[in-house]
Amino acid sequence: MENEFTNFDEIKTKIVNLSAVLSLPKGTEAFISDVHGNNDKYLNIIRSGAGNVSRKVEELFNGRLTLVNQKKLVCLIYYPEEVLQKSKQDVDPDEAEQWYMDTINRLIEVVRYVSNKYPRHIVDQALDSRFHDITKELVFEDFAAADKIAYYREMIKNLIDLNMSDIFIISMCHAVQKLAIERIHIIGDVYDRGSDPNLIIKHLSESWQNFDFEWGNHDILWMGSMAGSKLCMLNLIRISARYHNLALLKNAYDIDLTSMIKFATNRYVPLPNFEPKITSANVTDQERNIDNCVQQAATIMQFKLEGQAIKRRPEFDMDDRLLLDKLSLDKKKVTINGHDYQIENGCFQSVNPAKPYQITHSEQTVIIDLINQFTHSTKLNEHMWFMADNGSMYLKHNDNLLFHGCVPVDNDGNFLKWKIDGREYYGKNLLDYFEYILKDGMHHPTTGDCFNSDFIWFLWEGKNSPLFGKNKMATFERYFLKDEKLQQEEFNPFYKLCHNEWFADKLLKEFDINSRGHIVNGHTSISKDAPIMANKKIVLVNGLSDSIKDSDIGGYALLFDSYGMRLETLRPFINRQKVIEDMSDVVLDKQIVEHSSERKTVADTDYGQKIKRQIAKLSAQLE
C-alpha cells in the first residue's frame, strides 16, 4: 500500500510539473532557407537567433548601456572566441579585471532573461556541464540578495583569478545562442554550391537540440546519390565542379574523383562556357582546368542518362529535354521547336549521332566507380540519414505549413494530377508519395536503373516537380546557346497565385490546417516578389541565398514567438571577419506578420497538445 501511495505521489508531481509547463510562454521558432552549404553565413544567422539576441539585449539594457556597448555585447555573444581575443588587446591591463567582472555579470543577466520562458531542465541542457554548480548559483539564484552579493562577487573573481573566465564567457555566450531560439526550421537546400554543408550538419547534430529540415531539390541530389541514383550524382559533381567545390567530396566524404578527373582531362579541353565560378584568388590554372573539364564530362554523361530516363518514364512529360538527338551531324547546331540554333563551344565529341544517349564504355567505367563510392561512403550515409530522419517533404507545425518549392498547380489553382500505377496523386498526397519513394530508395540503395532512382532524380529537376517548381531546367541552353528566351525557366503558376488569399486558404485546407495558419515557403522565388503575400498568410523566407542581386538586402528570415510573427530583413553577409570588425547586426529591418493580443503559451502549441495528452493519461492512473 505504501508503494502504491508513493507512485501516486510521483504521478501527481509529474502532473503538477507538466501543467506548469503549459503556462510558460511559447518558445521562439526561427525559419530559414537556402543555406547552400555556406557554414559561416548559416552560423551568423543561428548565433544571432535570426536577430533575436540583439532584440533581447536591447530590451534588457536599454537606458543602462550605450548603443555602442550593446553592440559590443551582442558581437561577443555571436563570436565569443574571436571577440575575446580582440578585447584582450584593446583593454588596458589595469582594467582587465573590471572588464571581466562587467562582462560576466552582463552575460549572466542575458542568460537569465532568455531562459525565463523555459523549464529548468531545458536551461540545464543549454548550459556547459563543466560549470553546472557555478551557473546554478549565478543564473538561478537571487543575484541581488544583499546577504549573497559578496558571495557571488567572490565566485566571479575566482573565475578570473583561476584563468577560467574566458572559457566561462564562451560557454555563457553559447548558452544564450541556444536559448534565444527554441526550434530551427531549415526550409530546404542545406546543400548546393557552398563548401561546408558537412559542417552545418555537424553543428546541428552536436550543438542543437530542436530542429527540422524540409528538403530542397539540392538536398535531393545528395540523398539520391547515396541511394544510388547516377543522375543525381552526375548533377552533383557537375555543380561541385562549377563552383570549385570538388574538394568537399574527398575531404568530407572520402570520395576519390581520380577516375573522373583522368577521364575528363584526357577527353576534354577547357572551354569558356564551363569556366568555374570561383571567388578565391588562390586557385591554380591546373585546378581551374580540372573544374572546367570535369564539368564538361559530367554534363555530357548527365544529358545521356537523362535522355534514357525520360524515354523510360513518359509520365515525366519531359521530351523537350531530349536535345542530343536534335544536334546536327557536325554538332554545331541544335534544332529546338523547328528552329536551328548555333552551338557555342560545344563538347559533344563522345555523342554518337546514331545513338546519342548511349554511354560509352569509358564513361560507364567512371560512373560505376563513382556511384559505388557514393553509396558506400560511411560519412555520406550518416549525413544523409540525418537529413532523412530529421526531415520531410513538408511539415505541419503549430498551425503553420512549411515546405520548399511549391505544390504544383495549373493556372486556375487546381492541383496538378499525377497518374502512377493506376492511381492519381496531387496536392498533399503527391508530396507524401514522393517522400515515401525517397525514403524507400534510401532504404534500398541500388546503382541500377530503377523506378525509385528515376523518381528521385525527377524531384531535382522534373517538369513541375514540387521541389523544383519550373517547367524545365535549361542546363543545355545555358551552357551552349546565347538565346536568352531559350534559357528562361518558367515558374509553376503556384508562385503567382501565392499573392491571393483564396489560394492560401486552399493550400491550408488541403493540408488540414486552420485558415488562421500560415504557409512558410523556402526556395528562390520569382525575383522582386514581396516576401509577405496573400493577406499575410504566405511568407517567403530565403535568408541565406545569393539570389537577391544588386540589392543591399541579404534575404529574409522569420521569427515566431509568444507575441506573434515577424519577418526579419537581413543584411548581406560578406564574411565573418567583416561582421566582427563592424559589429554589424544581422537584421536590417523588421516587419510584423502577426501580432497576438494575448501572449501565446506552450498550451497553444503542438508540444502543448502532447503534454495535455500525457497529463490525461497520468490522471487516468489516479482514478
Q: Which residues does each predicted region cover?
A:
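Feature recognizes metal-dependent phosphohydrolase scaffolds
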Residues: 1-623
